[in-house]
């Protein structure tokens, strides 16, 4: 019986050690992947079109706001035949960002009160 107990403890110890090493490998891979995606995002961020600027050359190049990506909106000016495209933020997304900011500030106040 002592042998079975000793063997069980040894088996659990080896299993936990191998699990910890596998998790470390996964964490390292996740960190490498995260760093590469951040570098790609920074490289892509330099090429984006700011809000209210012309985006007719690339309609998917609008910059991101705090939470959402701006949308390339095209329209015909009054009395004009040429289409004009600019990066704009839709109103419903603007209101959602404002609500998220207010909720974040309110959450910070609650954390201060009870923190």
UniProtKB/Swiss-Prot annotation:
A Gene Ontology molecular function term of the record: toxin activity
Transmembrane segments annotated in the record for this chain: none
Keywords: Disulfide bond, Knottin, Secreted, Signal, Toxin
Protein species of origin: Lycosa singoriensis
Residues that make up the propeptide removed upon maturation: 21-44
Name the record gives this protein: U3-lycotoxin-Ls1a
Pfam families tied to this protein: Toxin_35
Tissues/organs with expression: Expressed by the venom gland.
């Amino acid at each position: 019986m002592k042998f079975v107990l000793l063997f069980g403890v040894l088996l659990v110890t080896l299993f936990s050690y191998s699990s910890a090493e596998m998790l470390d490998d996964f964490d390292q891979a996740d960190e490498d992947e995260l760093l590469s995606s951040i570098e790609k995002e920074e490289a892509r961020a330099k090429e984006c079109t700011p809000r209210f600027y012309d985006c007719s050359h690339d309609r998917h190049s609008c910059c991101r706001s705090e939470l959402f990506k701006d949308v390339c909106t095209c329209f015909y000016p009054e009395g004009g035949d040429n289409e004009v495209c600019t990066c704009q933020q839709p109103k419903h997304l603007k209101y959602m960002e404002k609500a998220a900011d207010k909720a974040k500030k309110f959450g910070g106040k609650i954390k201060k009160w009870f923190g």
